[in-house]
A protein has these predicted regions:
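"Short basic amphipathic alpha-helical interaction patches in structured regions
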Residues: 2, 18-19, 44-47
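Generic beta-strand structural signal
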Residues: 2-4, 12-14, 26-30, 56-58, ...
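Glycine- and acidic-residue-biased ligand/ion/polar-headgroup-sensing regions
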Residues: 2-3, 84-110
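Conserved short histidine dyad/triad with adjacent acidic residue
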Residues: 6-11, 62-67, 77-95
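Ligand-binding loop in jelly-roll beta-barrel domains
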Residues: 8-38
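Short gly/pro-enriched beta-turn/loop segments at secondary-structure junctions
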Residues: 23-25, 52-55, 71-76, 84-86, ...
Length: 110
């Protein structure tokens, strides 16, 4: 459950690696263009437990950092969920909004 936000802004050096020789790492990178250019480079990381995401959509990224989510420089809301067989979640995204779903394990019906 960690969510990281990295803003390259005017420039940043970055690499991804697994420091553990015993445990595998699973990650999902989502690239979102900022709504303005020339921002200072920045980094933010927040941990969300399984309980935070169990059976519900948990806001993990937003423009204003509400509900403890990481701050994203764009009009976007990112949600994470851990769902069991038969779980149902509902979210009203409002008119004119787009939706993208990433399933890390299992299957969903939309």
């Amino acid at each position: 459950g960690d969510v990281q936000r990295m803003s390259a802004g005017t420039g940043i050096l970055h690499s991804e690696y697994n420091a553990s020789e015993a445990e595998s790492v699973h990650l999902l990178q989502i690239w979102i263009l900022p709504e303005t250019t020339g921002l200072e480079p920045g980094y933010e990381q927040t941990h969300f437990t399984v309980g935070d995401r169990q059976g519900r959509l948990r806001l993990v990224g937003s423009r204003d950092g509400r509900e403890g989510s990481v701050t994203i420089h764009q009009d976007v809301n990112l949600y994470a969920a851990v769902l069991a067989d038969g779980d149902t979640v509902t979210q009203d995204f409002g008119p004119g909004r787009s939706l993208s779903v990433q399933v890390a394990r299992g299957a969903v019906h939309l």
